[in-house]
């Protein structure tokens, strides 16, 4: 990538800002070393990796920030046999191994999203776990980087001897100092070490009295440091022990280095992976801080779309940054931006260049959602004043040199940024030259952004296909830039307006306006009108956005309320169904107990009893069918529930007492048969009156108030008069018909979904006089089997239950035995 253009954009400064978010010096260096790439596949993959790290940083578990020592050079030396690491380098190596092990474990934590870790698998696989080697180093080397005494038995003994010998030597020197005359002693000095030997200080004039070896003297020469003859032997012994200690330390370091040398490739790979992860972490943190949205990438021929773009360096400075939107479509190759000075044109060019280049480095750019960038093969920039006295280049010559390089090198996949095109020379010639350059680049297909003050260049968009005008909005009242980019509208320079604002003599301003060519004046009026209309449309757009936001908020509120209403309806329905289920279970229990009592008391044949029991059960099921969904009307339910209980009790009593049910004889003495439509008294319902709906054999369906029950004919007596009309509660919905089945399969259901299925199957089985019901629940965890067992224990219609035999499904099936 063009280093000259990157320098103009201050790209290294931007990378240094991002690198400041790394946790280690190697990681920061890796960020600073990033260069724009042209491989679209790599760029997209690198951004995906940054997004993965960003997601992990924002997750509950966070990101593992382990220390990464800078041991690139020691790692290169590790490959060479015979070379050893120093104690400090070994300690740094242990730190690296520990960071590798911990980061490896963190990235493989099953609690982390697998989809995110998939982008980082190449780094996770490169990390190593060499804990034994790590611990061996930490046992031998202390935190201060020195080899511990217990690194080896020999070292422990040598250092013990050294300490003892040095102690003896110091005591000897102190005794020798005590023998000196008072005027030969140096009162404020004591035994010390000079040039690796233990010595005692004394006055120079005492030299002839003591003898020995002088190892040093003070700056004035008045004090000398002497090793007396009596201390020489001890000093030699200390030196021998120091040499022996150093030899043993080197042996320990060599042994530790040799232990990790076979793993130099793995350790180097782990180091590179940790550095790469730290680089990704720095970029992810920058993306979070700068609120960078994910972007897509395309070919330069398709143009690009920048949404809420912000200048990265201005953003880094912490000041207020006005975002901009910019779209260049496939057929638009050149954008010519015009407007007054200090309007932000140069800042816009640099922002586009920086955004494109940082994205091609794998660094998220400060953009909004739906942005799409192009992948350029190179960047060319002619921005700023590059005059050079040494090179004898004027400003105009420097511009021409850069423009010549651009014309020679730029391709259809390049990005070209040109600031103040046509400036530095005669405006007419500058406009002609600038127009020719832009026309050449446009016809070549090079994506170009240029700024200018020359009015003639603004007309280029009408002559050359692919050239579009743009301007940075300027407040004509305040004479201050708004930095809002307007595509399709050329900008005015506002030179005379600014001069008037700065109180240049009005007569001068008026004369200047008179001297303007008529075409220029007409163009200025036209642009002013366009700007006013644009401002009006912008205001209306803002008002519409406010209204739309209010509408969205209102719709969201309505949606929330609707959800709450639906939830309340579902809760009411659940409560009603639970109440209905409880009521039916109680009713079934009462009837079954009544049948059991009758069976014990009645002296009837078994078959006759079974017939009456079946009739009683049918009455219960039909009463349940009439109930349906009406249980949702909780306020009207109480009276009806009591009537149903009475009906069930009456049916059971009728089944047990066949003497009931003879109809009253009319006065003539003939027996009048009961039929459909007759009004009757139901003896089993405490004499309540009803109307026969239908007759089937020895049973009749009778409408009693809001209920319809099935009772034996013998329990009915003709009523002399029609019953008093009763308020009939509307019944909404019906209990669905349940087909008789010998087995029900509840596999795949949740535990709280089993009840309805099993109860419906039991109802159908009892209604059709089945003796067994197979409930298939599967083996699994046993939760469904336990729930089925609990239900069967509580249901009085079930006389017993067992697990299935080997040919019935085994432990995956429960067989319920019915009365």
From Swiss-Prot:
Residues 744-819 form the Smr domain. Keywords: ATP-binding, DNA-binding, Endonuclease, Hydrolase, Nuclease, Nucleotide-binding, RNA-binding, rRNA-binding. The keyword Cytoplasm does not apply. Its EC number is 3.1.-.-, 3.6.4.-. ATP binds at residues 339-346. GO terms for biological process: mismatch repair; negative regulation of DNA recombination; rescue of stalled ribosome. PROSITE patterns: DNA_MISMATCH_REPAIR_2 (PS00486), SMR (PS50828). SUPFAM superfamilies: DNA repair protein MutS, domain III, P-loop containing nucleoside triphosphate hydrolases, SMR domain-like. InterPro entries: DNA_mismatch_repair_MutS_C (IPR000432), DNA_mismatch_repair_MutS_core (IPR007696), DNA_mismatch_repair_MutS_sf (IPR036187), MSSS (IPR046893), MutS (IPR045076), MutS2 (IPR005747), P-loop_NTPase (IPR027417), Smr_dom (IPR002625). Homodimer. Binds to stalled ribosomes, contacting rRNA. Endonuclease that is involved in the suppression of homologous recombination and thus may have a key role in the control of bacterial genetic diversity. Acts as a ribosome collision sensor, splitting the ribosome into its 2 subunits. Detects stalled/collided 70S ribosomes which it binds and splits by an ATP-hydrolysis driven conformational change. Acts upstream of the ribosome quality control system (RQC), a ribosome-associated complex that mediates the extraction of incompletely synthesized nascent chains from stalled ribosomes and their subsequent degradation. Probably generates substrates for RQC. This is Endonuclease MutS2. The gene is mutS2.
